[in-house]
């Protein structure tokens, strides 16, 4: 099918902050052929291209003078199954949570801790998405991406993706690789990760006696729904700042003034701090400037109460960053990509 272009399209429905900016050109693509076609046409016109999925990791601060390519590919399949280990593949445009629930319905374990994360399958490896003690890299079996410089398809192994904390080769090389489909190694046996956050407590509260991947998923969904606002009701991009990793010396200096600092020692001797705790201690929780604000229940989440612009959201984020650095000597890094 020939790819269709539209002009001056509002991106409000395509980003979870609900920021109303316009794309000069916009196209939805549903398969590899349409992706190549759209990229080729953009190259002929000398147009830059911005690829988006669920729009849950974007902060749009201006109109986009480019072709915005919306990945709308769908499909999921089992590639191999030896009775215990199952490799499944999903197209980049598959909604992430729906894909996770599909794997659980098949009796496959591994993705349950990553339930209810907004976005699409293709975006998950970009950030090495993680939650409740599990990251994409822990269940990753490979992906296929298009090299936008050469037009060639390439398969990536776990090592080649160079995953880090909310980081990957693809995030460090924006615009180079377009992820088309991702593969995951799942199991029939449950290997439960229950020690991060209140997961174990929530399972107990829900009266779970038989531990299953679906029960863990349900518990995590209930926790997330309590803590995180639904983007359909209140514009947001989930956690807005990464948890900073700092030196042990800095943590001790902070602890001298704030004995309750939330800190997680890392294997390399550094320490990960809870960004939400820092922001809350600094008094930003529930803060609002016009329609840009910090969520009243979760200080790690910036929210758009309706009419905030991307520039206003960014200005608020910059104020928070400056204040946290002044108070604690800690630099907060934004998670969403800024355009």
Swiss-Prot record:
It comes from the Bacteria. SUPFAM superfamilies: FAD-binding/transporter-associated domain-like, Uridine diphospho-N-Acetylenolpyruvylglucosamine reductase, MurB, C-terminal domain. Residues 18-189 form the FAD-binding PCMH-type domain. The active site is at 166, 239 (proton donor), 335. One of its GO terms (biological process) is regulation of cell shape. Its EC number is 1.3.1.98. Pfam families: FAD_binding_4, MurB_C. Transmembrane segments: none annotated. Pathway: Cell wall biogenesis; peptidoglycan biosynthesis. GO terms for cellular component: cytosol. It is found in: Cytoplasm. Its cofactor is FAD. It catalyses: UDP-N-acetyl-alpha-D-muramate + NADP(+) = UDP-N-acetyl-3-O-(1-carboxyvinyl)-alpha-D-glucosamine + NADPH + H(+). The keyword Flavoprotein applies. Keywords: Cell cycle, Cell division, Cell shape, Cell wall biogenesis/degradation, Cytoplasm, FAD, Flavoprotein, NADP, Oxidoreductase, Peptidoglycan synthesis. One of its GO terms (molecular function) is UDP-N-acetylmuramate dehydrogenase activity. Belongs to the MurB family. Cell wall formation. PANTHER family: UDP-N-ACETYLENOLPYRUVOYLGLUCOSAMINE REDUCTASE. This is UDP-N-acetylenolpyruvoylglucosamine reductase. It comes from Pseudomonas putida (strain ATCC 47054 / DSM 6125 / CFBP 8728 / NCIMB 11950 / KT2440). The gene is murB.
């Amino acid at each position: 099918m020939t790819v269709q272009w539209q002009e001056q399209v509002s991106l409000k429905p395509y980003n979870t902050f609900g920021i109303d900016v316009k794309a000069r050109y916009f196209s939805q693509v549903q398969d590899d052929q349409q992706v190549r076609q759209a990229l080729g046409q953009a190259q002929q016109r000398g147009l830059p291209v911005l690829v988006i999925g669920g729009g849950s990791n974007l902060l749009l601060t201006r109109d986009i003078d480019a072709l915005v390519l919306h990945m709308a590919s769908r499909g999921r399949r089992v590639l191999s199954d030896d009775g215990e280990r199952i490799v499944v593949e999903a197209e980049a445009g598959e909604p992430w949570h729906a894909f996770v629930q599909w794997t659980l319905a098949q009796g496959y374990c591994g993705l349950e801790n990553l339930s209810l994360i907004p976005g699409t399958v293709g975006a998950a490896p970009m950030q090495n998405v993680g939650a409740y003690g599990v990251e994409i890299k822990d269940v990753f079996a490979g992906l296929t991406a298009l090299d936008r410089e050469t037009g060639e398809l390439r398969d990536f192994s776990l090592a080649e993706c160079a995953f880090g904390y909310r980081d990957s080769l693809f995030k460090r090389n924006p615009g180079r690789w377009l992820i088309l489909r991702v593969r995951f190694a799942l199991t029939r046996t449950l290997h439960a990760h229950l020690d991060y956050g209140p997961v174990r407590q929530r399972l107990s509260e829900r009266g779970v006696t038989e531990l299953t991947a679906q029960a863990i998923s349900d518990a995590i969904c209930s926790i997330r729904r309590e803590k995180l606002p639904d983007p359909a009701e209140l514009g947001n991009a989930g956690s807005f700042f990464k948890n900073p990793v700092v030196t042990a010396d800095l943590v001790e200096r902070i602890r001298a003034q704030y004995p309750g600092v939330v800190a997680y020692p890392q294997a390399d001797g550094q320490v990960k701090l809870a960004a939400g705790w820092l922001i809350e201690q600094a008094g930003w929780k529930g803060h609002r400037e016009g329609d840009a604000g910090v969520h009243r229940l979760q200080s790690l989440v910036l929210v758009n109460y309706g009419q905030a612009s991307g520039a206003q959201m960014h200005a608020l984020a910059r104020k928070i960053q400056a204040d946290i650095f002044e108070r604690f000597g800690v630099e907060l890094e934004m998670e969403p990509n800024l355009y």
